[in-house]
């Protein structure tokens, strides 16, 4: 399977900082445009996610970057051969853990209290495609 990807991230006309970040094949993208083509072999791994920092709170850009970097480390460290059920369980555990890390960051840095992010994307693992 060949994946043709393009990432475009821009601060826009309203805000002064970009709270969004994309993770594409191990690279982080904010305030940039790039293209990427990946040829997935049966056991290839690939990840493409977008984390959108929550507007209305300080630190959305911090939360989105924390989530993207954390997912990259999580995904890179996954062992081979996990069953679908085990993989899904590990992803759910990761979601709980990164949520706690982001909340703890806000608790430790009061100026960022309430920070948060959304995260959506897909990843390829062991010949299957998953949505997150």
Task: Please report, for each region that a protein language model flagged, where it lies by residue.
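PP2C/PPM-type serine/threonine phosphatase catalytic domain
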Residues: 1-132
